Amino acid sequence: MLIPDIWAETCDFDPEQREFDIEPYYTGPLLDAHFHMPAAFAPPPVVAHELPYEIAVFDDHISKDGLICLLDKQNIKSVIGFYPVLDNLPLDSIKDMKYFEEKHPDRVNAFLLPISISQWMKDEWPVLPGQDLEQYLEMLPFTKGYGEFAFYLEVYERQDEHLEADDPEMIETYEILEKRNMIFMSHPGNRDMPALLKMIEKYPNIIFLFHGEEIKKPQLSQILEKYTNVYYSLDYNMISNCCLHNNPQTDSKETFLPKYRDTFEQTMKDELRIWKPIIEKHPDKIMWGTDILKPWHIDEEVQPLLIEMSRSFIGGLDPAVQEKYAYKNAERMLGMVKTTQLPVDTTIPAWIYFHTWVNNLIQLLISNVIIGAAAIVAAIVGIVFAVRRRSGGTKRPKPARQDLEDYEEQYLQRQGQRPRRRHAKSRPTSSSCNSCGKPLKPTVKFCGSCGTRID
């Protein structure tokens, strides 16, 4: 990624020194699948009173460019950023969303969480009505998802009532998300899962992204295996036995860091023992995240240590799974890259591996037999030719001193033909026939005129 010159003056890109020597250690890119964007302003008292924690605020705790620097220093390619938007004060939040989209494209994958204060003041669920949600999305067409929708928050409860995932207010939201091909991200509790599973089946074209330790691990594994439109992000507040959120003993930088450092190595062993089998069973469905939210989470001493914990954890996974968990699964879910691997369990049965192994073995044996036989034949032929060459070969030599006619006679006899009469040796005869007196050639046997034999 090319960094503008101005960044060299404002952001220190020197790599952070590791505090722990844990190997193997993942050093590749990351994509944070659960990052709470700092609010545009401090929430009003009526909202702050209902929140169980303090949230980070832009320019109070970190600048917008400082946030990008925070990501760059840790080789975090991008984040899934959750923007809280209050319907009575939306403009500042909308400006923040547009700022990152225009100045730092592809660094923050915007998820919108509109909270309807006006609905809440009327003692109704603070879920933004569908018509208003459509207006927001028209202004923010780059929005990729809706959430984090935390069903456990007190704003979604009153007396004995609880907002259900299949209530009419939520159905209206799902219809809009399906039409716009957006992701629904939620933090459900155990009591929310039956209604959510109905929605997962009713809206197969919506991707449902979950996180949270309330979902029991056996149930999570079953859901990931059954539904192709469900993903899960495993975040810091689960990969730590001293927890980042809502723990009075560690709810500040000063109390968190000592305990986190003391338990770092043991935490790695414990969490890998628990999560490694689940991640490797569903290598295309689980992704890394931070759940950064509070002001001290983005502290320059805390955040690097959290990243070190994550990289140590990823290094303990199967190398074939590490990049998928670190960033590739999130990119595929967001539609940032194409892939030929479907987000389903595509494990090849063991019997197919055995069958393939047997076939390969048979083919290897046949090949070796053929090669061996060919080598033996070649050796035999070579020996025969060598012996023949040494003994003079099988070629029949022509007699060097035999008379031509004798050679011809032998040849004709071999061919089954009668040999021609051999010429008599020349001998002197009388010069004329004794009977008729005709002159004769010296070697004739009969007189050409009267036929008398010449002896």
Predicted regions and their residues:
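Cys/His-rich metal-coordination motifs, chiefly Zn-binding "fingers/knuckles"
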Residues: 422-455
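Acidic-and-aromatic substrate-binding clefts and catalytic sites of carbohydrate-active enzymes
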Residues: 42, 56-62, 83-93, 117-129, ...
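Hydrophobic faces of well-ordered beta-strands that scaffold small-molecule active sites
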Residues: 31-35, 78-81, 108-113, 146-148, ...
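Selective detector of the "anchor" transmembrane alpha-helix that sits immediately C-terminal
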Residues: 366-386
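Acidic/histidine-rich helix-loop elements
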Residues: 35-62, 121, 156-162, 242-245, ...
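Active-site gating/metal-coordination segments in enzymes
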Residues: 9-18, 88-184, 254-256
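Catalytic pocket-lining loop regions of alpha/beta-barrel enzymes
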Residues: 162-288, 296
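Mid-to-C-terminal alpha-helical segments outside catalytic/metal-binding sites
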Residues: 3-33, 38-42, 47-78, 281-285, ...
